[in-house]
Structures are given as C-alpha cells and as structure tokens.
C-alpha cells in the first residue's frame, strides 16, 4: 500500500494537480457529494472491556446541510452524552477508538437509549436530525455457531439475531448495521438482507474491500453497502475497483474514517 500511495503522489506531482484530483481522474466518479460522517461515540466489544457487546454505536447527523454543521452537531451530542452518562453514575472513560465505554447495566439496548437522550438534550430530533448506526463486529461474538452477547447472557443464531435487529430498528432510529453477522455466515447475511431491505447493511469483515468477495455478495444479495479500507486490499487501484463495482451495482460505499 505504501508503494501504491507513493506512486499516486508522484503521478499527481508530475501532472501538476492535487492528489484528490488525480484520484478522481482515475476513478471517474459519476457524481460528487459531500461526505456524511458516522461518529463512533460509544465503544464496546473488543474496543472496551466490560461495555456493550456491540463494538461501535454511532451517530449520523443526517439533518446537517454542510460537513461543518455535521461535525458541530456531533460535537454537541458527544458533550451531552458525557453529561447523560454522568447523570446515570456511569464512568466517562473512553475505549480504544475514543468513544465513551461505560459498563452498561441493562444490555445493549440501553446504550441506544442513552444516545437518544443525548441527542434530545442537545436539541435535535432523533430520526430527523440525527440517526444511529452500529458496528456489531459479529465475527468476534461468534462461537460454536452462536452469537454470544455476554452482557445480556444471551445466545443467538443468525435468524434470532436478525429478529433482534428488526426489533431494535423499529424501536430506535438505527439506519445502518455493519458486520451484523459473522464474515462467513453467507446464508445468514442473505436472510438478514431479505429481512431488512431498507436498512444499510455494511460489510467490513465480510468483504475486506475485496472485489471477489464483493461480487459474490452482490450476486447472492448478502448486503447492500461496503466499508472501504485501502489497507485491507493493499493498493489504491484495487480500492478504486471495489468502489466502482459497488456503485455500479447500486451499493453504498463508506470510506473508513
């Protein structure tokens, strides 16, 4: 990857253009749009011992009209989340990725409730101004053909976990689920996609920015969005190919940030 990026920098310099313009010339995007950040404000799973089973609980400022406003809204909510946690006697220590990592007492759903409270306290409307997203990192929870939610002392198979997701998205404004099932649970992913057709279902561990795995997922209706990480596939060219393949098939692309 280092060599690939160095070549891209050198090519941009030799052409006398900025790097992002050089990459755009290679990728030939069909449309231009401002990025919508997804901010990891509650850490769990492998990123925070003793917190939620879900690895990342995120906020998405969907009502923002500019990137600057999106960051401002998110910062306000993050500050309110700290006050919300303190008000409930939870610690405000942080996990590996900078989000709060409280020892939630009543399971994963309580974390979503805390986020809604923080959003409202910041003066925003959940589901209108700000929505939620999760990175379950389900491969880390998968043992002996079951998904183990230790904080709730529960075990799920792919079907019952899908039902739990359905319940959560009807109760909370969750619009995106990343790695909701294990990376090789292809049948489970197909069922998840069929069950939640309006939810963004993101493959990270499932797809690893690999066009072969992405093509298989597309052909088998196993997800509808891909997380893009150049370090997973190893070159800028292969990264661009993955983005192009996803967009050509109507998938959303999320550049890891």
Provide a role label for each language-model segment.
Residues 1-43, 47:
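Hydrophobic alpha-helical hairpins/lids featuring a short glycine-rich hinge
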Residues 4, 12-15, 67-74, 78, ...:
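Generic structural signal for well-ordered, non-membrane alpha-helical segments
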Residues 7, 74-81, 85, 115, ...:
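Hydrophobic alpha-helical packing residues
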Residues 13-16, 86, 247:
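Anion (oxyanion) recognition and catalysis
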Residues 17, 90, 251:
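Short glycine/serine/threonine/alanine-rich loop segments
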Residues 28, 32-95:
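Mobile "lid/hinge" segments at catalytic clefts and subdomain interfaces of large enzymes
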Residues 56-67, 91-108, 137-152:
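Active-site-proximal beta-alpha loop/turn segments in soluble metabolic enzymes
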Residues 109-257:
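Catalytic core of soluble alpha/beta enzymes
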């Amino acid at each position: 990857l280092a060599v690939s990026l160095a070549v891209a920098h050198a090519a941009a310099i030799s052409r006398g253009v900025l790097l992002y313009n050089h990459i755009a010339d290679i990728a030939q995007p069909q449309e231009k749009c401002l990025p919508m950040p997804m901010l990891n404000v509650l850490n769990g799973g492998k990123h925070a011992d003793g917190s939620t089973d879900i690895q990342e609980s995120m906020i998405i400022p969907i009502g923002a009209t500019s990137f600057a406003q999106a960051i401002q809204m998110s910062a306000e909510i993050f500050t309110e989340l700290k006050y919300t946690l303190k008000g409930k006697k939870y610690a405000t220590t942080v996990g590996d990725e900078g989000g709060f990592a409280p020892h939630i007492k009543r399971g994963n759903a309580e974390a979503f409730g805390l986020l809604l409270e923080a959003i409202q306290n910041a003066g925003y409307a959940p589901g209108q101004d700000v929505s939620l997203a999760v990175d379950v990192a389900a491969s880390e929870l998968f043992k002996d053909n079951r998904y183990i939610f230790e904080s709730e002392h529960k075990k799920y198979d792919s079907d019952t976990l899908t039902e739990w997701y359905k319940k959560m998205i009807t109760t909370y404004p969750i619009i995106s689920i990343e790695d909701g099932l294990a990376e090789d649970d292809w049948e489970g992913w197909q069922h998840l996609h069929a069950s939640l057709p309006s939810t963004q279902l993101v493959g990270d561990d499932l797809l690893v920015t690999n066009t072969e795995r992405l093509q298989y997922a597309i052909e088998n209706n196993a997800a509808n969005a891909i997380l893009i990480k150049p370090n997973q596939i190893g070159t800028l060219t292969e990264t661009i190919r993955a983005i192009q393949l996803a967009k050509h098939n109507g998938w959303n692309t999320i550049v890891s940030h």
